[in-house]
Amino acid sequence: MSNQLSPKPPVNPIVMGKIGSAYGIRGWLRVFSSTEDAESIFDYQPWFIQSKSGWQLVEIEGWKYHNQDLIIKVKGTDDRDAANLLTNCEIVVDSSQLPDLGEGDYYWKDLMGCQVVTVAGYELGKVIDMMETGSNDVMVIKANLKDAFGVKERLVPFLTEQVVKRVDLSTQTIEVDWDPGF
């Protein structure tokens, strides 16, 4: 009997990537990483996926690059059929594993659900998603139902100082210098 404790399911889960399609016939799978450097996803262990019965531990046997794809071998997944069962599952870890960020840097997960208000006090709506465009991140903001401009969704660049004037995570508020009609 092993004295080693099994990893605990995430208390504060965060999605770090997604398992893609099967690769080959020996149970390898493509992985799509949400980390800045694709292979940094392996720095965060253990991995979990959500199944019908709850959290399921995913143990990595190995990983490598194949062309531009990152592929993994999951312990106990030895053929294509077993690999296909994991396709499209989100890779989740506990957010306590994430490093602390410096002043003015934020994890996207912390910005989700924040109310976005202009410097003039107009409520633009809530952040429902973030997008990476290459030059800068963009907030996807779901407008309030009674938006005076008839807008349902806004895309606002997350440019500190230029557009984003203040972020207060304790009150879940982001203040922006942005024209509500845009």
Swiss-Prot record:
Q: Which Gene3D superfamilies match?
A: PRC-barrel domain (2.30.30.240), RimM (2.40.30.60)
Tell me which stretches of the chain form a coiled coil. none
HAMAP family, alphabetically? Ribosome_mat_RimM
PANTHER family for the chain: RIBOSOME MATURATION FACTOR RIMM (PTHR33692:SF1)
Q: Return the domain comment text from this UniProt entry.
A: The PRC barrel domain binds ribosomal protein uS19.
Q: What family does the entry list?
A: Belongs to the RimM family.
**What protein name does the entry list?**
Ribosome maturation factor RimM
Question: What is the organism field in this record?
Answer: Pectobacterium carotovorum subsp. carotovorum (strain PC1)
Q: List the taxonomic lineage.
A: Bacteria, Pseudomonadati, Pseudomonadota, Gammaproteobacteria, Enterobacterales
